[in-house]
A protein has these predicted regions:
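Active-site-adjacent "subsite" loops/lids of carbohydrate-active enzymes
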Residues: 133, 199-217
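Solvent-exposed loop/turn segments at secondary-structure junctions
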Residues: 175-176, 197-200
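Secreted/periplasmic carbohydrate-active enzymes, especially glycoside hydrolases
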Residues: 1-191, 217
Length: 217
């Protein structure tokens, strides 16, 4: 939503490095990514390379357990699954060892789906209807525009919203650095992530036609 002539809902353009940048030395075969697909009982890990094998150590309250990493994937099943929610933001720390590479990460057990409850479709968290009470978060900072002065600023904003009774942030047309989402996961804040803008805007095409319909009584 950045234009050369800002006005209305269009913003002043900015530029520069606003995401995390780093240099990393890795072995020839390394863990390219860490993706989790979770249910309320298990998490399936994908490291992005089918040739990798190794181990995954999961920290649990009852003690750690080790699962094999085979074909770049691992199935992680805690003995006593504890679901994540804004009221109980429980995370499972994991250590992934594959060859000479080692990565530390985490996952949470959570489901989000639409189910019929009380005769109406409801947005459900972990199988039960849940009221997501949120605010719009545009990700601007008075001292850094798109970048906060410190990662601690993320936590301050999240905790301030929780203190006001909110459990959800709608991140508006901006993808934040991973530290923001980690803070939300750890502190118990749901995130509704907007897609970024990818073109021009036409009121008839983009607002009227997609919502045009007929109602009968």
């Amino acid at each position: 939503k950045q234009v050369q002539t800002p006005g209305g809902m269009w913003y002043t353009p900015v530029s520069g490095i606003w995401q995390t940048v780093w240099l990393e030395s890795v072995p020839d075969r390394y863990i390219r990514r860490v993706d989790f697909c979770c249910t309320l009982e298990e998490a399936v890990l994908d490291v992005g390379d089918e040739s990798l094998s190794g181990t995954v150590t999961v920290a649990c309250p009852e003690g750690p357990f080790i699962a094999p990493l085979e074909g770049g994937r691992a199935v992680l099943r805690p003995a006593n699954p504890r679901p994540w929610s804004p009221e109980d933001p429980f995370l499972y720390p994991v250590t992934i060892q594959a060859g000479e590479d080692r990565v530390e990460s985490y996952f949470a057990l959570r489901t989000l789906e639409i189910k019929t409850a009380g005769g109406r479709p409801r947005l459900c968290l972990n199988g039960a209807p849940y009221y997501f009470h949120g605010v719009l978060d545009q990700g601007y900072w008075s001292d850094g525009i798109f970048t906060p002065a410190s990662p601690a600023a993320y936590e301050e904003d999240i905790l301030a919203m929780k203190a006001l009774g909110f459990n959800t942030l709608r991140k508006h047309i901006k993808v934040e650095p991973p530290l923001f989402y980690y803070a939300c996961d750890r502190l118990g804040m749901a995130v509704f992530q907007d897609m970024v803008n990818n073109g021009d805007y036409r009121y008839l095409r983009d607002t009227v036609l997609p919502t045009l319909g007929f109602q009968t009584r």
